[in-house]
Amino acid sequence: MTGRIHSVETMGTVDGPGMRMVVFLQGCPMRCAYCHNPDTWNETSDDVKFMTVEELWDQYERNRQFYTNGGITVTGGEALMQIDFVTELFTYFRERNVHTCLDTSGICFDPHQEVAYRKLLSVTSLVILDIKEIDPDKHLWLTGKPLEPILGFARLTADVGIPIWVRHVVVPTITDNADHHYRLGFFLGSLKNLQAVDCLPYHVMGTAKYKELGIAYRLEGIPAATKDLAAKATRTVVEGIKAYRR
């Protein structure tokens, strides 16, 4: 089986524990207003590479000495668009005692295909889940997609018991609503498998790609978020988690 690969980063340090090989898959159904990789949206691209599990393993092996406390992370694009390939990839790596991390929005989750998702999670060591917004209407505006599949996927990870880290990007005037952060925390409090929450400050470093691709940037004029704003959001999310767990 081959996967549609956008790129491979051999020395990733922010996509899971330790040093990791990070595989960026091509294709994503979401159109997040602040996405910094719009070149991964389309399933086909002139730059897409088709790689087998064995080819990715060979690439991992060449740098394995650096991955002692790390492993492999698959992200995107949206990794779940190629769930069969990711399942095969993770199975292969787990059989060789490599830590596997799935970085996803969860948007592709379909409860009617739960067996396939459970199979993937059975060979996943860690899930990093990006929750863009907890308000359904705001989420639809921000991403072009509904919120419920994402929450459903989060609940499934809890049911399976896979450790989960949650990320949320704080965008000034867009996702910096304290009430929404509290509600996000209240939902996360229901996930017994939650290990970490990270509210990240929005940045504008990806805007040049939009100009290159001829795509209008919907957040034009909105400034980057400060670290203080992101830290404040994290504190509010934690308050919501604690409130649920009282």
Predicted regions and their residues:
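Auxiliary Fe-S-binding modules of radical SAM enzymes
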Residues: 2-17, 170-246
